[in-house]
């Protein structure tokens, strides 16, 4: 197996419907600017409440193959 390096970033996704949809929103958005996503790990969940409206929020660590540069 070849050696490889992965970078991990933190993202927060939000949804008025569920934590699952919040996580999916973050991952979907990440696919627009990142390549070769590998693993998403939920590190925190909370619910933001404003004027009686709930927003489910998920903090994720997402890893992707590092190709250098920054």
Regions found by a protein language model. Name each.
Residues 1-70:
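N-terminal, polar/charged subdomain of small-to-medium soluble alpha/beta proteins
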């Amino acid at each position: 197996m070849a050696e490889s390096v992965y970078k991990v970033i933190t993202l927060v996704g939000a949804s008025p419907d569920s934590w699952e949809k919040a996580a999916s929103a973050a991952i979907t958005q990440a696919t627009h600017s990142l390549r070769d996503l590998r693993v998403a790990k939920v590190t925190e969940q909370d619910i933001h409440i404003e004027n009686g409206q709930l927003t489910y929020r998920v903090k994720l660590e997402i890893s992707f193959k590092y190709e250098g540069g920054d």
